[in-house]
Amino acid sequence: MARAPRSPHPARSRETSRAHPPYGTRADRAPGRGRDRDRSPDSPGNTSSRDGGRSPDRARRELSQNFLARRAVAERVARLVRPAPGGLLLEVGAGRGVLTEALAPYCGRLVAHEIDPRLLPALRDRFGGPHHAHVRISGGDFLAAPVPREPFALAGNIPYSRTAGIVDWALRARTLTSATFVTQLEYARKRTGDYGRWSLLTVRTWPRHEWRLLGRVSRREFRPVPRVDSGILRIERRERPLLPSAALGDYHRMVELGFSGVGGSLYASLRRAHRAGPLDAAFRAARLDRSVVVAYVTPEQWLTVFRTLRPVRSRPAGR
């Protein structure tokens, strides 16, 4: 994970909420931005014996802790979350509580998760009074938390390095209504088609989840200043899925075949499982050229292709 450079300016407020150095799965990580760079034994301040030999600065970097410098940004994010009035809201990565404070008026109950044990006492002190009786601070790894049985919204200024795991958790949660994350801008743009290209994850989950980019947050809003800007990513679980549950397995198999890259085009990949006539008809219905590369096919075009092809049985292997 890339080390965030130090800001040339002092932070505007001590009340801060977390943002994070660049996100990096093995597939999406830019060269030289790996987590191991932050874990070098030559990192400054590594001689402290606290926290198992980690200095507070090193622990902060390993937990992807960069903090929002202005409360106004947290309030902007909170307005975009829009949880159900009186409903349950979970926050992942409470940090020092700035976003928590901004979210609290918008929900009936708020459970704020924070993995860093050093931040928990201050959080519990800040939200322990009667004004925040509906707020509960939860320590530990959010990814180990059980999914609520009741409908809930999810929000957070999440670690770039843990974005994939947190997003997967949200997508698997059957009672989720929406998730609103501040995360790496590149990731948010990639997942929402903002580059004009669409990812496998977005297309695969589109029948049940809508992905949107709600805005961006400048890197200058964080202290220390990270290398990249952040985006506000919104994932909404559809009240009425675009496909019936019985069709999802076939849809997922078609999408995975299409993203296999065999033949260099979506048509060539799908031709392995479908006859030319029905496939040509599906491409005409979706207004797709046979030479189109899979990344440039929108989720709605995928659905048109699938709905046109679904009555057609796949060819047996080898034919």
UniProtKB/Swiss-Prot annotation:
Protein family according to the UniProt entry: Belongs to the class I-like SAM-binding methyltransferase superfamily. rRNA adenine N(6)-methyltransferase family.
UniProt organism field: Streptomyces fradiae
Protein task: This protein produces a dimethylation of the adenine residue at position 2085 in 23S rRNA, resulting in reduced affinity between ribosomes and macrolide-lincosamide-streptogramin B antibiotics.
Example of a GO biological process term: response to antibiotic
E.C. no: 2.1.1.184
Region annotation (Disordered) ranges: 1-59
SMART domains in the cross-refs: rADc
Enzyme class: transferase
Biased composition (Basic and acidic residues): 26-41
GO cellular component, one term: cytosol
Binding residues annotated for S-adenosyl-L-methionine, in chain numbering: N66, L68, G93, E114, D141, N157
Enzymatic reactions: adenosine(2085) in 23S rRNA + 2 S-adenosyl-L-methionine = N(6)-dimethyladenosine(2085) in 23S rRNA + 2 S-adenosyl-L-homocysteine + 2 H(+)
InterPro entries documented for this protein: KsgA/Erm, rRNA_Ade_Mease_Trfase_CS, rRNA_Ade_methylase_Trfase_N, SAM-dependent_MTases_sf
Keyword Transferase attributed: yes
Record keywords, A-Z: Antibiotic resistance, Methyltransferase, RNA-binding, S-adenosyl-L-methionine, Transferase
Official protein name in the record: rRNA adenine N-6-methyltransferase
Domain of life from the UniProt record: Bacteria
Gene Ontology molecular functions: 23S rRNA (adenine(2085)-N(6))-dimethyltransferase activity; RNA binding; rRNA (adenine-N6,N6-)-dimethyltransferase activity
Pfam families per the UniProt record, alphabetical: RrnaAD
Annotated PROSITE patterns: RRNA_A_DIMETH, SAM_RNA_A_N6_MT
